[in-house]
From Swiss-Prot:
Coiled coil: none
Organism: Methanosphaera stadtmanae (strain ATCC 43021 / DSM 3091 / JCM 11832 / MCB-3)
Stated name of the protein: Glutamyl-tRNA(Gln) amidotransferase subunit A
Assigned protein family: Belongs to the amidase family. GatA subfamily.
HAMAP family with a match to the protein in the record: GatA
UniProt EC number: 6.3.5.7
GO BP: translation
Length: 455
């Protein structure tokens, strides 16, 4: 049953919100000890919400777009009365005193928030191994990482623990785990979704987005969370369109799909072979394939990390142990410490022009060149991650870990929308097809996903 079909079934009283919740909770109880997707639950509060929805439906009262759907939230998004730790001992006792804008919008539409999902500490990672709660296990490839930093949110969907989850994406943190876990993940255009209430990693790169098992779940959640927010001045001040319409009767007839040569060249051969099958599927559905070249791909990771380091260093200065929590440098893990140290170095006045300003110049160059590529096509398609996920606990060099994001950081640098959906299996492990489009062309990506999903 697709997500939108479940909402209709709940509203038509074919199933109840309470039944849906209890089924999901039973799955969590059965699987979470092994998977560690959820790090915090409030089942009693969720039950009260579900019971209220059922009562209103029974009384023929109006209910919201998400009526009765079970929702999981990444642990760096403020939800009142939950511990918003960002999986770090720095904030292990910090209770959210307010709801992020996206949370209020979910609750206003009768979503049932069941709990918070695991993640890399402060979203600084690509494996969900750096969490103070321990690593998350990949439900689709047991023993392997689920990707990160939103690994718990992806794993929860892959294990059918909830209907939709939210994650945040700084350089691939939604798309990377969506690829490894074989689910759908969507990073909207920068500014399409409010970041108010997000404990951000890098403010100019971060974006909140959904995970689901089908495009109706993605479209439904985008309809709820997208839109202008006066509390976040980076949000786009225009009414977003109905994303659900892009999940029905979608076609690739007359569409031009770009394939970037360099994206394929740096990807493992087995993954490239599988991605080519998805591209062949697009051709059979009526799309024209156009080969593109992006020679500045090697600029992506260094540009991204220079910006990331400086913005992360700035964002973490408030965690000084004075108002709440611990001083971050005294309790954080190795990856967070590394980023703080490098960010501090780059931020020193005598170096700011040498590194950070150069990174901003490179960002403008990348944005301009990538947008030129997108002018000639509707969507760019290619692999989400260039290699398969490693095994949990396997020693891996820092730069090899960073390389997981080489194909995803470009969307954050440029602010464009991007998604990942399952392309197939390589060595019995899911690999994702990444789709990217021009800013505010989120609907083109969702329509392409739907055409592939339904055909």
């Amino acid at each position: 049953m697709k997500v939108i079909e479940k909402v209709e079934a709940i509203k038509q009283q074919e199933i109840t919100a309470t039944e849906n919740l209890e089924q999901m909770y039973s799955t969590i109880e059965e699987k979470n000890d092994d998977i560690n997707a959820f790090v915090q639950l409030d089942i009693e509060k969720a039950r009260k919400t579900a019971e209220d929805i059922d009562k209103r439906i029974k009384n023929n009262e109006e209910t919201g777009k998400l009526a009765g759907l079970v929702i999981g939230i990444k642990s760096n998004i403020n939800v009142e009365d939950f511990i918003i730790s960002a999986a770090s001992p720095t904030l292990k006792n910090y209770y959210g005193s307010y709801n992020a804008t996206v949370i209020n919008r979910i609750l206003d539409e009768d979503g049932v928030i069941i709990g918070l999902t695991n993640m890399d500490e402060f979203a600084a990672g690509s494996s969900t191994e750096t969490s103070m709660y321990g690593p998350t296990n990949n439900p689709k490839a047991p023993g392997h990482i689920p990707g990160g930093s939103s690994g718990g949110s992806a794993a929860a969907i892959a294990a059918n623990m909830c209907d939709i989850t939210l994650g945040s994406d700084t350089g691939g943190s939604i798309r990377n785990p969506a690829s490894h876990c074989g689910v759908m993940g969507f990073k909207p255009t920068y500014g399409m979704v409010s970041r108010q209430g997000l404990l951000d990693l890098a403010m100019s790169l971060d974006q909140i987005g959904p995970f689901a098992n089908d495009t109706t779940g993605i479209g439904l959640m985008l309809n709820v969370i997208c839109g202008y927010d006066p509390y976040d001045t980076t949000t786009i001040n225009k009414q977003p369109e109905d994303f659900l319409k892009d999940t029905t009767n979608s076609t690739l007839e007359g569409q031009t799909i770009g394939v970037v040569k360099e994206f394929m060249d740096i990807t493992d051969d087995k993954i490239t072979s599988q991605i080519n099958k998805s591209i062949d599927d697009m051709t059979s559905l009526g799309a024209e394939i156009k080969e593109l070249s992006f020679e500045d791909i090697n600029l992506g990771l260094p540009t991204y990390y220079l910006i990331n380091y400086v913005e992360f260093f700035s964002a973490t200065r408030k965690y000084d142990g004075r108002k709440y929590g611990e001083r971050i440098e005294e309790v954080c893990g190795a990856e967070v410490a590394r980023r703080i140290e490098i960010g501090s170095y780059i931020s020193q006045k005598e170096f700011s022009g040498k590194y950070y300003n150069k990174a901003l110049q490179a960002r403008s160059l990348i944005r301009n060149e990538f947008n030129e590529l997108l002018n000639d096509v509707d969507v760019i398609a290619g692999p989400t991650v260039p290699k398969l996920p490693h095994k949990i606990g396997e020693e891996i060099e820092t730069m090899d870990m960073y390389a997981y994001d080489v194909l995803t950081v470009l969307a954050n640098i440029t602010g464009i929308p991007a998604s990942s959906m399952n392309s197939g299996l390589v060595d019995n492990i899911p690999v994702g097809l990444q789709l990217q489009a021009k800013p505010e062309d989120d609907h083109k990506i969702l329509s392409t996903m739907s055409a592939l999903e339904n055909n």
